[in-house]
């Protein structure tokens, strides 16, 4: 009749959620995402590092329910570009999401379908509201794992294909020791 409430332990230091489904994304899983393809290939052939891990607690895909997940985004760069998550729109575009930074330093890159972009820096305690219709990607700009918690509608779904095809209109790089958000020369609108 009623769904059972659920309580789980989240380790804020490691990002692990007990009993959660784990997804691991290596650099080899992100072919075509980084601008410097030669450096990407060298890194994949040499070590194929883990870029990020997701620990997800998912419900049935139905309206009114919520999923939550932590992501551990490791430090690193491909060329000048900081490590980032693949990024996505929601399959149901009118669904929002909330991110809460737990550890480390990074930010959220957001964009509309037309490519209008926003950058929101994140550190522990930062809460980011991702409005409906905005694609979003997190970026680790620090030198330790960037860990955050995401809460989103169970029926939101993920559209990774649009970002895989078009990319984001901006990229986040390190230049002269500073974090810079610059135009992506490969952006396809």
Swiss-Prot record:
UniProt KW keywords: Cytoplasm, Gluconeogenesis, Glycolysis, Iron, Isomerase, Metal-binding
A single Gene Ontology CC term: cytoplasm
Pathway the protein takes part in: Carbohydrate degradation; glycolysis; D-glyceraldehyde 3-phosphate and glycerone phosphate from D-glucose: step 2/4
Top-level taxonomic group: Archaea
UniProt-annotated location(s): Cytoplasm
Positions that bind Fe cation: 88, 90, 97, 136
Catalytic reactions on record: alpha-D-glucose 6-phosphate = beta-D-fructose 6-phosphate
Top EC class of this enzyme: isomerase
Gene Ontology terms for molecular function: glucose-6-phosphate isomerase activity; iron ion binding
Record-level GO BP terms: gluconeogenesis; glycolytic process
Database matches in InterPro entries: G6P_isomerase_archaea/bacteria (IPR016758), G6P_isomerase_prok (IPR010551), GPI/OXD (IPR051610), RmlC-like_jellyroll (IPR014710), RmlC_Cupin_sf (IPR011051)
Cofactor binding notes: Binds 1 Fe cation per subunit.
Predominant location: cytoplasm
Cofactor: Fe cation
Bilayer-crossing regions: none
The enzyme's E.C. designation: 5.3.1.9
Recorded family membership: Belongs to the archaeal-type GPI family.
Subunit structure: Homodimer.
Name of the featured protein: Glucose-6-phosphate isomerase
Organism: Pyrococcus horikoshii (strain ATCC 700860 / DSM 12428 / JCM 9974 / NBRC 100139 / OT-3)
Gene: pgiA
């Amino acid at each position: 009749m009623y769904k059972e409430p659920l309580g789980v332990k989240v380790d804020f230091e490691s990002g692990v959620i007990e009993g959660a489904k784990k997804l691991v994304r290596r650099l080899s899983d992100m072919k075509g995402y980084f601008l410097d393809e030669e450096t990407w290939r060298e890194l994949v052939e040499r070590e194929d590092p883990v870029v990020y891990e997701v620990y997800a607690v998912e419900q049935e895909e139905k309206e009114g329910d919520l999923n939550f997940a932590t992501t551990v985004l490791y430090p690193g760069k491909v060329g000048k570009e900081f490590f980032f998550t693949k990024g996505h729109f929601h399959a149901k575009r009118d669904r929002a999401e909330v991110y809460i930074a737990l550890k480390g330093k990074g930010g959220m890159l957001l964009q509309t379908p037309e490519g209008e972009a926003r950058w929101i820096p994140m550190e522990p305690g930062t809460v980011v509201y991702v409005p409906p219709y905005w694609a979003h990607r997190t970026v680790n700009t620090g030198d330790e794992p960037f860990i955050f918690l995401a809460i989103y509608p169970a029926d939101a779904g993920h559209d990774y294909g649009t970002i895989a095809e078009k990319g984001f209109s901006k990229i986040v790089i390190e230049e002269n020791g500073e974090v810079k958000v610059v135009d992506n020369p490969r952006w396809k609108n």
